[in-house]
């Protein structure tokens, strides 16, 4: 059975026939963000069922809002990406992703699988007790609503990818976490007002507890901004213009925040599967109490928020940190290969621009060998660092979750860079041609 005819039947957002202007990209990005917030205000029909407050682990990394059309958030998209990368990386699916045609096939398969996961994760949510005990008719209605909302999110992400700036996944995460941080700090019951209130009555110990999440959030913000500026610059020479030189920057966080998004989504899925299986009477991944894993592998993959939890069970914190680092490295390496950021693909792009590494022969092979010395080690180190920082930030109790803050700052920083590139493309297309292909 051939898969391509099936992929052709899946509706898709039409690709732009001509270049989308900077102004139009801003408009499309803003419109999609507004639509996403609107979806987050539309409650699904629950037939009187109540949603227990036990799915907090799911909300940050999936940019979801429980009980609305975006209850599943970007979960199906990200989970599909994880599984497809693992299948290609282990060669269970044989695809040479250096070829554009195969990359297009990979993206089509990922989208098809993502739509399937919209229904599967909806079934798991209902089965895991997200809406309490419901009858079969209401369960079906809930599943269809959750799946429909998740499919809409897939297409909103596709609109941003083709007509907007950045990716919908990053945009939705950043918007959700930013909202959580603002409400947590400045809302009516925000930590800032509680801090001032405690200080006014001289309760310094309590005041410190209230200000610590805000300080932790600021610390993560400053660390991420600093690390985003670290890069290795490789000198380049132009083949046709004598004396023309440039620099090719390879960032320390080479694959951006994708490894953390994928790793955190994997951990959230382990919790979801564990809760579902435990409710079905098969506690393979662990046992749960009030929606929290208390034993098994699911317990060790759950985030130990706060210093008190680390002190009470340091083994849990060590295992969680180690797994976050390992999976970030694996996903970082997979992402480099599947997204055309590997040395071979980048050497080809530089060669097409008639660029060569200064002091070396002008050949694609020479450029590739030179880039190999940097890209893989930097990918490993950068992915390991963001994994460690995400875990450590979670331990501090930062507003929006440590992982959420890290992702948001990184996403906004990259979005700013893309905005600069888009402006360059309109001011000087020749310059942007090189900048955009980096």
UniProtKB/Swiss-Prot annotation:
Residues 44-54, 130-136, 187-209, 279-315, 398-400 are extracellular. GO terms for cellular component: plasma membrane. One of its GO terms (biological process) is intracellular protein transmembrane transport. Component of the Sec protein translocase complex. Heterotrimer consisting of alpha (SecY), beta (SecG) and gamma (SecE) subunits. The heterotrimers can form oligomers, although 1 heterotrimer is thought to be able to translocate proteins. Interacts with the ribosome. May interact with SecDF, and other proteins may be involved. It is found in: Cell membrane. Belongs to the SecY/SEC61-alpha family. It comes from Methanococcus vannielii. The chain crosses the membrane at residues 1-43, 55-83, 105-129, 137-161, 168-186, 210-231, 257-278, 316-335, 379-397, 401-415. It is a multi-pass membrane protein. Residues 84-104, 162-167, 232-256, 336-378, 416-438 are cytoplasmic. It comes from the Archaea. InterPro entries: SecY, SecY/SEC61-alpha, SecY_CS, SecY_dom_sf. Its main location: membrane. This is Protein translocase subunit SecY. Keywords: Cell membrane, Membrane, Protein transport, Translocation, Transmembrane, Transmembrane helix, Transport. The central subunit of the protein translocation channel SecYEG. Consists of two halves formed by TMs 1-5 and 6-10. These two domains form a lateral gate at the front which open onto the bilayer between TMs 2 and 7, and are clamped together by SecE at the back. The channel is closed by both a pore ring composed of hydrophobic SecY resides and a short helix (helix 2A) on the extracellular side of the membrane which forms a plug. The plug probably moves laterally to allow the channel to open. The ring and the pore may move independently. Residues 55-62, 63-74, 75-83 dip into the membrane without crossing it. It holds the Pfam family SecY.
